[in-house]
Amino acid sequence: MATPEFDLNDIKRRMQGAVASLSKDLGSLRTGRATPSLLDPIQVDAYGSMMPMAQVATVSVPEPRLLSISVWDRSMVTAVEKAIRESDLGLNPQTEGQTIRLRIPEMNEQRRKEMVKVAHKYTEEARVAVRHVRRDGLDHLKKLLKDSAISEDDEKRQATDVQKATDQYIAEIDGVLASKEKEIMQV
């Protein structure tokens, strides 16, 4: 039984946002496999402003270790190439007309371990975000109890629901990390 002042669904929605943000962050990590999301963080200087890669080109994966970037405007090819070179991905673009090819080199063991550390950092940030949402929810419940808007039993029941949601989303975050870690360490 939810009170009008307390919305568990809002808390769950905010926790799900932390999981979605983690998935996006982990998607941009290099794993040794070619994925279009690898280029998502790259901004291209196009027509006087910075634009995401997806707004100036189409990225496809013709082979497991090759990205093919089809630039829509021929005049943007050099800008896209420059943006890739200046990114911290360490990739060397090869231009063929309006198409840019990116070979994704196999990562060595040290680089894989570095990527796993970065993945753990992103994951910890997501866990902290979920815990902040939990704290906000519990603080709100305590305020409602103090203002006599809900009974002590309702506060305890809803606090238990908030903790269950927290545990569920932390487990989901751990699952996302385990999957990404396996993908990174796979040779």
UniProtKB/Swiss-Prot annotation:
It is found in: Cytoplasm. One of its GO terms (molecular function) is ribosomal large subunit binding. Its main location: cytoplasm. InterPro entries: Ribosome_recyc_fac (IPR002661), Ribosome_recyc_fac_dom (IPR023584), RRF_sf (IPR036191). Gene3D superfamilies: 3.30.1360.40, Ribosome-recycling factor (1.10.132.20). It holds the Pfam family RRF. Keywords: Cytoplasm, Protein biosynthesis. One of its GO terms (biological process) is cytoplasmic translational termination. One of its GO terms (cellular component) is cytosol. Belongs to the RRF family. Responsible for the release of ribosomes from messenger RNA at the termination of protein biosynthesis. May increase the efficiency of translation by recycling ribosomes from one round of translation to another. PANTHER family: MITOCHONDRIAL RIBOSOME RECYCLING FACTOR PSEUDO 1, RIBOSOME RECYCLING FACTOR. This is Ribosome-recycling factor.
